[in-house]
C-alpha cells in the first residue's frame, strides 16, 4: 500500500508514471473513495525485535508521521478536487487492527494512541466526507481483520466482514450528505 506522501506525488507530479493513470481515472468520477493513512504508521513497525524497544525507539517518528499526515491529507483532497471538482470524496479513517486480538494486546494501546492522533488529520478538511471506521471497528465484537505476522511484517488488512463494515460506513456517510 501507499503512504500519503506517495499518493500525493501520484496526483500532483506529472513526471510520475502513475500521474496520468490516476488523473485519467479521476477526471470523470462522480464518487471517489480514499483509504490512506495507515501505511504512514505501518512502515515504522519492526516486529522482529522487542516491541517495547520498537515503540520507545520510534516514538518521535510516530509523532512526526502523524503530523506529516495532517499536512499531506488536505493536499491530497485538493489534488483530487482539482481533477474532479464535482466528485464526492469519502475517506475512511484508520482503524486499529489489534483491537480484540489477545496476542496483540501489548501493542494495542500504543497503536490506539497514534492512530487517534493520525485520525485527527482527517478532521476539518473541506470537500471530504469522513466515515468513522475507527469507531465501527473499535465497537465491534466480531473479528474484522486478518491480523497476522508473516516474516518481519504485519498484515493488518480487513477480512470480508471488515470490508463490509467499511463499505457500510462510507455509504452511511454519503447518504447523510444527500439528506
Description of each model-found segment:
Residues 73-77, 119:
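Generic structural signal for well-ordered alpha-helices
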Residues 55-68, 108-116, 153-156:
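A short acidic, glycine-rich active-site loop
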Residues 150-179:
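Histidine-centered active-site loop/cap adjacent to the catalytic His
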Residues 97-133:
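Substrate-gating cap/lid alpha-helix
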Residues 7, 41-46, 98-102, 138-146:
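Short acidic/His/Gly/Ser-rich catalytic and metal-binding motifs that mark active-site loops
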Residues 30-35, 88-93, 129-132:
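Structural recognition of the beta-strand scaffold that forms the well-ordered cores
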Residues 8, 66, 70, 74, ...:
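Short, amphipathic alpha-helical "lid/cap" segments that border enzyme active or binding sites
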Residues 1-67, 71:
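Conserved SGNH/GDSL esterase-like catalytic core that processes O-acyl groups on lipids
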Amino acid at each position: 500500500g501507499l503512504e500519503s506522501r506517495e499518493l500525493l506525488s501520484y496526483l500532483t507530479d506529472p513526471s510520475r508514471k502513475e500521474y496520468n493513470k490516476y488523473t485519467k481515472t479521476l477526471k470523470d468520477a462522480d464518487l471517489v473513495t480514499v483509504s490512506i493513512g495507515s501505511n504512514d504508521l505501518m512502515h515504522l513497525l519492526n516486529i522482529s525485535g522487542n516491541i517495547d524497544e520498537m515503540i520507545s525507539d520510534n516514538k518521535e517518528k510516530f509523532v512526526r508521521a502523524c503530523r506529516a499526515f495532517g499536512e499531506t491529507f488536505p493536499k491530497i483532497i485538493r489534488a483530487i478536487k482539482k481533477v474532479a471538482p464535482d466528485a464526492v470524496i469519502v475517506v475512511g479513517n484508520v482503524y486499529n487492527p489489534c483491537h480484540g486480538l489477545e496476542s496483540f494486546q501489548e501493542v494495542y494501546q500504543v497503536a490506539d494512541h497514534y492512530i487517534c492522533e493520525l485520525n485527527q488529520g482527517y478532521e476539518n478538511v473541506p470537500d471530504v466526507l469522513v466515515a468513522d471506521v475507527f469507531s465501527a471497528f473499535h465497537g465491534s465484537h466480531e473479528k474484522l481483520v486478518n491480523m497476522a505476522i508473516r516474516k518481519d511484517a504485519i498484515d493488518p488488512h480487513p477480512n470480508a466482514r471488515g470490508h463490509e463494515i467499511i463499505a457500510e460506513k462510507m455509504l452511511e456517510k454519503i447518504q447523510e450528505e444527500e439528506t
